[in-house]
Amino acid sequence: PVAQVTAGAASTTGWYEGDYNIPTQSGAALGDSNTGMHLTIGVLAALAQREKTGEGCYVYQSMHNACLNLCRIKTRDQLTLDRIGYLTQFPQYPDGKFGDCVPRSGNTEGSGVLGWTYKCKNWANDPNDYVYVILQRGAKDFELACHALGFDDWLTNPDFNTADARDKHKNEVWARIQEFCITKTKFEVTELLSKAGVPVGPVLNTKEIMTDPHN
């Protein structure tokens, strides 16, 4: 947790408005396992260097730097924010205000596409009956998504038929996809959209993870 807060992960994670707009820890142990993986990469690189040059070296890896590497998308966003003053993929755009640092962004995907977590039909009884859907920027990808969702009218609507337009109308995009998802379970949404090539995944709880044959 300390590495997460010092490396920028907590400041960019969590809800972006209201009483819940506070720095948030990840449920994943970002510092522990990630530091080991980074250290392993460093050791392997040092071994390769020794084989080539005959010289060894000291390998060091901190939890802070390991977590910082995982925040590289957010540091990229900081460079964009410094340059133009706003971030189009964030929920604050176009109507909200941006400060001088990357804000929290809820469940947006964060790298230029419209991703969000949607309630599915059993959400009232199952707190994890949600699905994550990404609406990509490419015209062909968008067309496939519209056909799968039954939103063919979006293909000719200037509010939605370009990526830049969707950035400006993201709340309407999210609301309509929510209407689609709420009629199905997370697994039904995942099966339907994945067949069409739409990036999608169910929110699996810890019990489901333990019994998933793919794990």
What role is predicted for each listed range?
Residues 63, 135, 202-205:
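Active-site proximal loops enriched in glycine and acidic residues that flank catalytic Cys/His/Asp
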Residues 13, 47-51, 152, 184, ...:
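A general structural signal marking secondary-structure boundaries and capping sites
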Residues 67, 168-169, 208-213:
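Beta-rich nucleic-acid/ligand-interaction surfaces
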Residues 194-215:
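Conserved PLP cofactor-binding pocket of PLP-dependent enzymes
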Residues 1-130:
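Active-site-adjacent "lid/gating" segments in soluble enzymes
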Residues 114-196, 200:
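Aromatic-enriched alpha-helical interface/lid elements that frame and gate functional surfaces
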